[in-house]
Amino acid sequence: MIKLGIVMDPIAHINIKKDTSFAMLLEAQRRGYELHYMEMADLYLINGEARARTRTLSVEQNYDKWYEFGSEQEIKLADLDVILMRKDPPFDTEFIYATYILERAEEEGTLIVNKPQSLRDCNEKLYTAWFADLTPETLVTRNKAQLKAFWEKHGDIIMKPLDGMGGASIFRVKEGDPNIGVIAETLTELGNRYCMAQNYLPAIKDGDKRVLVVDGEPVPYCLARIPQGGETRGNLAAGGRGEPRPLSESDWEIARRVGPTLKAKGLIFVGLDIIGDRLTEINVTSPTCVREIEAEYPISITGMLMDAIEARLAK
């Protein structure tokens, strides 16, 4: 029997209709895995050995009672076959410390999804720089004058912090906007933090597409998140409307280009953000949108994931 651990935000507070981690747990349970639940505070190191307080878990698709804890135990993380790291951002120093603990378990043979070192290496906004021919025009800087010059060149740009999620603190700055200076100062904290600027992509009106990649293989359907009511942002957390659809030709091209690199880095479950035919983000920490896609199309993305995990464990 496969022992699967999950590190996640409190399960009592999730929305099971939308929660991808919950979908993963349902599929793992369907396959007869033993489920071990952990939150960040449950992980610890003692003399270099990664350990945790875990609670065995059962889940069900029931809006009144979707989980039940069984026994509680202190275990070596190496006793688990696989651990899903599904803690949502912020990707802060605490998150990084947790990846070091998980890496100790990985060195003792536990499969970690996604690979701890790659979680640290691949910032969701910055990692697109390794595929620069696929992205919009992009500037990463702390320098207000550089941001202003980039804006003057393109006339209509998007500016965002490097550590946001769910569309937080994303600004669209159009030609002639008198606020460019204060937006640059705010995002860079007066030149003390890096931020990103990209040329505005009009294709956002047709949706910001979340394309999932499982162990290097693109999922054939994506979720287009369409901005509502004059918004620039399609993120569901910012009120965007989700519309599942098949991948376009350019979606396939991008996912097939990026996929092998993700697989080689141990990034087994990844969400690409694509606007039109441009790659804007590579989400590695806790990608979502599985439930929305699975509700519309006859596909089990969590099944693809568990197949990939089983294949890796069999090696």
UniProtKB/Swiss-Prot annotation:
Record-annotated ATP-grasp domain positions: 125-310
GO CC terms, sorted: cytoplasm
Key word Signal present: no
Family of the protein in this entry: Belongs to the prokaryotic GSH synthase family.
Any one GO MF annotation of this record: metal ion binding
InterPro entries in alphabetical order: ATP-grasp, ATP_grasp_subdomain_1, Glut_synth_pro, GSHS_ATP-bd, GSHS_N, PreATP-grasp_dom_sf
Reaction equations catalysed: gamma-L-glutamyl-L-cysteine + glycine + ATP = glutathione + ADP + phosphate + H(+)
Residues that coordinate or bind Mg(2+): 281, 283
Domain of life: Bacteria
Protein's name according to its UniProt entry: Glutathione synthetase
Residues engaged in binding ATP: 151-207
Gene expressing this chain: gshB
Keywords: ATP-binding, Glutathione biosynthesis, Ligase, Magnesium, Manganese, Metal-binding, Nucleotide-binding
EC number: 6.3.2.3
Keyword check for Magnesium: yes
Pfam families: GSH-S_ATP (PF02955), GSH-S_N (PF02951)
Cofactor: how bound: Binds 1 Mg(2+) or Mn(2+) ion per subunit.
